[in-house]
Structures are given as C-alpha cells and as structure tokens.
C-alpha cells in the first residue's frame, strides 16, 4: 500500500554489506517473492537494485500477502475489514474493551469490534491516541533518558521534528513514448537541484553487491525489474522512487500548509502530526504527495533536457496503474515514525547503540525478549531550509548532526513489556507504536 517494493535490509560482513540472515515469517514471504519472480521472469531477483537484492511489484506483493493469510480467513480464525478508521475506543474503567470504526468511503458502513485484547499496529497509533494511553511523539529531550543524540532543549521546531514521510512513485516503461506528468502547483526547480548534479540512471547490474557506489542513481536505487541486463521482454522494466530528494520533513512546513491547518483548526500548525486527526494529517500529506510528483516532473523535464534522450529516461516512464487510485500513486505514504507508547519497559539508545563499526551484544538484553534485531539507525533528513525569503518557495532537506545514516545498533532484543502500556489493560502496541525512544526506533 506504500509502494515500497525493494527490501532494504543488510548487515556488514568483512567490510561489505550483505543480506542479514533470514528466518521465520520474513523468510517465508521472501520465498514467495522469489517464487513469483521466478515464475514471471525466470529469475528470483530481477531488480538489480542498489539498495537490496529482493524486489517485488505492487500488485504481486498484494497477492502474496493475501495468499499468506488466506488459510486463516478460510478457517474463520481471521476476518479482514477494509476502508475503516478508528473513531472511538470503548473502555470499562481503565480497561480497553473495543474500538468503533467509521468508513473511509461513503460505501463503507461503520463497525464496532469488541475484544479482550486490542493491538494497535497502525502507522500513527490511532487507537493508542484515542484510548487515552500515555504516549510520546517527536524528540525526547536529553534530560529524560540521557541519550547522546537527543536534543538538550527544543528549538523553533519544537516537538514537530520527525523522520520524514515519502510518497513513493512506482513507474513502468512506456515503450519509448513520452509520458510527462503535469507540473504540480507546488513545483520549484530549485527544490530538486540535487538531481541536477548526478546521473539519473547508470548502466549497472549491481554485480558488485548491494550499495556498490557505481550502481547508485535515482533510477537504479530501488529498481524493481531490470529488463536491460536480464534480457527480459520490452515493457517489463519497472522502478520506484524513494530517494532522499523526495523526503518530506514534518516540521518547518510551507506557509500554504500551515495556513490550511490553521483555517481548519487554529493552533494545529504547531502540533506534531501524530496528535492531529485524520482530516488534518491529510492537509500535510497532500503537500508531501505534491512534492514527490514535483521530483518526478523534474526528472522528466529539467534532468531530461540536461542529459539528452536515452531509453531509460524518466520521460519514458509512466505511473503504474496497479494501485487502482485516481492519481496512480500508492494509497498512503511511506511513514517511518509514528507515536511511541509509554510502556512498562522503554528501550533507549543507551541500551543498544553500537559504539564501534563492529557491532557486538547490546548493553542491555531484556529477560522477557520476544524478538531479536540489529539494524542501521536510519534517520532520513528531518528538517528543511528555504532557499528564498518566500515561506512557500523552494526548499531543500537538512540532515542534522545527530540524526543521519551514520549509526547502528548492536545485536539486541526487544522486551515483551515494551508492548504493554503503563496503564490501559487490554491494549498492546506493535509496529511503530512500542516502548522505544525516537533516538533509535526507525522501523524499515
């Protein structure tokens, strides 16, 4: 649903990045991905992408996940409801007893679900927020957990700073035809000047391994199907854009966005996006979508004019129709950070951040561990700077000194108590919404 079809997971071994060991449900899904690609293209890994060896196209991914849960649906142990949003949490005293949903479309009726346990694995933690459970959003100050990368005090961005969202763009070759999208209203060429200094496409089959520098370009970064190097049929080439230039910081918002928020709800432009109801989040996310389309437009026009015509030009790529959306974009953006549950146990940066380039066992290994992990602490650019005096004008992203791609975790485990709120029996967190601090919790 986010269009993220290149699985970016790695670990460093002998100075080179390689896939981390696969197991469990993750391995099962990868086997299904490889089986689909082998049946469709004759090879299990057709993408030759810079960021990962495993790639899958949107419609195929949806089918794989549907097939994965189909036996449970058939047995009646799982029921799937779609196009619903939580609007009310039902409680008896402090205990959570259910959730009331409203339809996100006119055709979807409302629904009330009563259950002894409610698990919130949503992007923004909607049920946790509505339940009254304690949670955090945005940065924690250094004084709270004594984390080295935490700010000592808030500046003008306050608590709004988050890992940015990205509206991904999935593209297929248009068989040599031009398929240039209209110029988005918010487009400014200067916002995408970083693309004017690099090659939009490189002729690499990534035989040097993932993250080989010679294979990096916006096109090959997360390519889904490489028909040129794999000698596949014309029309099969596919890629998707999830490049830092399209990242959309959630603080220092453009004036048009702040005005839209204030007109809808005074004071909301200064709040963290997590705290906002759905209709206010949509004001911000609509501008994030426009920014992503601006990047594609820039690649199809300004970058094409600079490089000249060639078969892999973005000018000859069209938006996929696999999502079934009017604008042919994924129905939701790639959301890297939501709220953080105030849980019985909160894992901090001091518990697991690697002190060397050779990760070892984490400083704290919880005795109630439910899963093991090790990953790169992946902050995309969290802030923006405006390039003119116009607060609606062109802007570019900023990486801060303490939030970037430069840190890793040791070999760590996550505690069961990190899913349990300090007060709200019957409620559990999952996914983004667990007991962790923003200094390290950046789920892929």
Summary of predicted features, one role per range:
Residues 2-88, 163-164:
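Conserved N-terminal/central alpha/beta ligand/cofactor-binding core
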Residues 90-91, 146:
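Short secondary-structure boundary/hinge segments and terminal tails
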Residues 60-64, 294, 444:
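Short amphipathic alpha-helical face segments that pack within enzyme cores
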Residues 2-3, 83, 106-117, 121-443:
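Flavin (FAD/FMN)-binding glycine-rich loop and adjacent Rossmann-like elements that form
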Residues 93-99:
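Short, hydrophobic/aromatic-rich segments at coil-to-beta transitions
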Residues 92-93, 301:
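Short acidic-glycine loop/turn motifs at beta-strand connectors
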């Amino acid at each position: 649903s986010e269009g993220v079809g290149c699985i970016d997971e790695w670990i460093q071994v002998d100075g080179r990045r390689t896939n981390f060991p696969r197991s469990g449900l993750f391995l099962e899904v990868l086997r299904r991905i490889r089986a689909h690609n082998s049946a469709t293209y004759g090879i299990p890994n057709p993408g030759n992408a810079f960021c990962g060896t495993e790639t899958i196209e949107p419609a195929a991914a949806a089918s794989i996940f549907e097939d994965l849960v189909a036996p449970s649906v058939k047995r009646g142990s799982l029921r799937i409801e779609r196009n619903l949003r939580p609007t009310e949490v039902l409680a008896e005293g402090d205990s959570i007893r259910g959730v009331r949903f409203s339809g996100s479309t006119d055709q979807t009726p409302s629904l009330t679900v009563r259950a002894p346990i409610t698990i919130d694995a949503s992007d923004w933690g909607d049920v946790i927020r509505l339940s009254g459970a304690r949670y955090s959003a945005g940065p924690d100050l250094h004084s709270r957990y004594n984390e080295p990368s935490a700010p000592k005090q808030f500046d003008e961005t306050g608590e709004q700073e988050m890992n940015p969202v990205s509206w991904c763009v999935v593209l297929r070759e248009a068989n040599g035809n031009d398929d240039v999208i209209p110029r988005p209203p918010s487009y400014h060429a200067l916002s995408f000047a970083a693309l004017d200094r690099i090659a939009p496409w490189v002729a690499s089959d990534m035989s040097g391994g993932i993250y080989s520098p010679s294979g990096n370009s916006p096109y090959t970064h997360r390519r889904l199907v490489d028909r040129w190097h794999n000698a596949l049929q014309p029309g099969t080439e596919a890629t998707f854009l999830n490049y830092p230039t399209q990242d959309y910081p959630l603080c220092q918002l453009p004036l048009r966005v702040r005005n839209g928020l204030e007109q809808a709800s005074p004071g909301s432009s200064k709040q963290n996006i997590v705290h906002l109801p759905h209709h206010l989040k949509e004001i911000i996310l609509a501008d994030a979508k426009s920014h992503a389309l601006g990047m594609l437009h820039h690649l199809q026009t300004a970058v094409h004019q600079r490089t000249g015509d060639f078969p892999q030009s973005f000018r000859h790529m069209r938006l996929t129709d696999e999502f079934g959306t009017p604008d042919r974009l994924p129905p939701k953006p790639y959301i890297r950070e939501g709220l953080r549950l105030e849980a019985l146990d909160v894992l901090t940066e001091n518990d697991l951040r690697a002190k060397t380039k050779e990760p070892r066992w984490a400083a704290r290994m919880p005795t109630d561990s439910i899963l093991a992990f090790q990953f790169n602490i992946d902050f995309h650019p969290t802030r923006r700077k405006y390039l003119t005096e116009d607060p609606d004008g062109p802007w570019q992203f900023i990486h801060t000194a303490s939030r970037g791609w430069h840190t890793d975790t040791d070999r760590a485990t996550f505690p069961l108590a990190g899913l349990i709120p300090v007060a709200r029996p019957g409620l559990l967190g999952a996914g983004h919404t667990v007991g962790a601090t923003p200094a390290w919790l950046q789920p892929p």
